């Protein structure tokens, strides 16, 4: 076997192994449909319409505190979503991002609060148990960042160490205009620093981070039917798999636990 062939085979094995870490993924397709994606088989094993909601879902995430899949509706209603698609209301946020914007949602595993970010820069922190929302600092690039003065366009975001009982975490975002990975630190202040370019178009992408609970974090991005791994140190996105059975705009993804 030629050296080039060996290297290609090794790369394929490594990418297959990496995709396996993502395990089962819930992908929000359109306004109200969940595609259940098996990253090992590289296909959607089912498409489920979410019932019991009034309006469009704008984001989904797994809450580390209870392992359940949550969804946020455009009017601020927070629901849990069962495997059969049935939505059960948890609360209604007292403050919500304006309709028509791209919304990013992800649970802070250390604080057990839902981060809600609008593509206009609004930066919210919500208690999903009672719906109370704290409006944090609007997003802006750090004074020392190369993008200082530019308007952020965050279209995805996720925390590392996303497991129950996490003591430390950090928030990473995707900017659709720059096409790059950002770090939001501190998250409550909304200060953004560029990590690096993804190398792909990023205006319509979904983003989440898988954590093993021992410090390992693998970032994943889905654009249409393509799943990418994202290097949190450089921002580079690398194609991991083409997922069959997924059609339409994937608005968000949530990596499911224990699958």
Predicted regions and their residues:
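An edge-strand/N-cap motif at the start of beta-rich repeat modules
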Residues: 22-40
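Short loop/turn segments that connect beta-strands within beta-propeller blades
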Residues: 39-42, 82-86, 127-131, 185-188, ...
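Conserved beta-propeller blade signature
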Residues: 24-28, 68-71, 113-116, 166, ...
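Structural signature of eukaryotic scaffold interfaces centered on beta-propeller domains
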Residues: 58-67, 96-112, 148-167, 202-215, ...
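Gram-negative bacterial Sec-dependent N-terminal signal peptides
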Residues: 1-22
């Amino acid at each position: 076997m030629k050296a080039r062939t060996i290297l290609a085979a090794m790369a394929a094995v490594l990418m297959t192994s990496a995709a396996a870490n993502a395990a089962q993924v819930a992908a929000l397709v359109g306004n109200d449909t969940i595609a259940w994606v098996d990253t090992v088989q590289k296909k959607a094993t089912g498409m489920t319409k979410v019932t019991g909601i009034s309006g469009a879902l704008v984001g989904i995430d797994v809450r580390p505190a209870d392992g359940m899949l949550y969804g946020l509706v455009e009017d601020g209603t927070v629901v849990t979503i069962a495997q059969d698609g049935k939505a059960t209301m948890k609360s209604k946020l007292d403050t919500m991002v304006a309709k028509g914007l791209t919304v990013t949602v992800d649970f802070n595993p250390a604080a057990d609060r839902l981060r809600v970010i609008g593509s206009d820069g609004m930066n919210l922190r919500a208690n999903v148990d009672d719906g109370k929302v704290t409006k944090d600092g609007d997003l802006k690039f750090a004074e020392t960042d190369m993008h200082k003065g530019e308007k952020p366009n965050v279209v995805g975001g996720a925390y590392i160490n996303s497991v129950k009982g996490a003591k430390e975490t950090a928030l990473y975002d995707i900017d659709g205009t720059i096409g790059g990975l950002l770090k939001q630190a501190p998250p409550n202040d909304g200060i953004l620093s560029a990590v690096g370019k993804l190398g792909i178009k990023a205006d319509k992408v979904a983003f989440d981070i898988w954590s093993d609970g021992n410090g390992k974090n693998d970032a994943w991005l889905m654009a249409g039917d393509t799943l990418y791994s994202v290097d949190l140190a450089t921002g580079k996105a690398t194609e991991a798999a083409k997922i069959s059975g997924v059609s339409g705009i994937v608005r968000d993804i949530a990596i499911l636990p224990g699958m």
